[in-house]
């Protein structure tokens, strides 16, 4: 569980203008809509587990800078890797992230998601603090999202 919290807490989300039709440009609203879409997908009893996983993967791939998150996870080791090793790592990290995300989030399909606050770090970067409230014996998960807005003027 600690790995999930660490992974989610350090996730880099990028607001992409191509997603502007679906998600709001306000970082707090964007994160709220994104998380609520994921919870809605996971709690849909008429959808198979495989389809739920594919839908969550799609949301993640469209909104998470997986490569940047992978490089962040590598730390200074990334500087020692050869290009082919880095390419293989990026491929495997994406598979790992998506599998972990879909399997762990399925336990929170009936949970409540709340945005608690946000702090604008720069014109393009905002930290959004949120919580997924656990049900029964599940612990709450505190998540800090780093939202990067490509074009804040729009």
Region locations from a protein language model:
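Surface-exposed, charged secondary-structure patches
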Residues: 99-144
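Short beta-turn/strand-loop junction motif enriched in small, turn-promoting residues
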Residues: 44, 132-135, 147-150
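Short beta-strand edge/turn micro-motifs at domain boundaries
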Residues: 140-154
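Positively charged n-region of N-terminal signal peptides that target proteins for export
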Residues: 1-4
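Boundary at the C-terminal end of the N-terminal hydrophobic targeting segment
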Residues: 18-24
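Early exported N-terminus immediately downstream of N-terminal targeting peptides
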Residues: 24-101
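Bacterial N-terminal signal peptides
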Residues: 7-16
């Amino acid at each position: 569980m600690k790995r999930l919290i660490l992974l989610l807490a350090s996730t880099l989300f990028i607001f992409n203008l191509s997603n502007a039709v679906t998600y709001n440009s306000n970082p707090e609203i964007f994160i709220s809509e994104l998380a609520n879409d994921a919870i809605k997908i996971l709690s849909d009893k008429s959808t198979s587990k495989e389809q739920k996983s594919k839908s969550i993967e799609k949301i993640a791939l469209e909104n998470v800078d997986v490569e940047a998150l992978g490089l962040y996870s590598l730390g200074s080791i990334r500087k020692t890797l050869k290009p082919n090793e880095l390419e293989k790592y990026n491929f495997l990290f994406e598979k790992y992230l998506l599998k972990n995300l879909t399997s762990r989030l399925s336990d929170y399909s009936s949970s409540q998601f709340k945005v608690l606050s946000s702090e604008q770090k720069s014109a393009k970067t905002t930290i959004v603090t949120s919580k997924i409230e656990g049900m029964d014996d599940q612990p709450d998960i505190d998540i800090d999202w780093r939202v990067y807005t490509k074009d804040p003027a729009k």
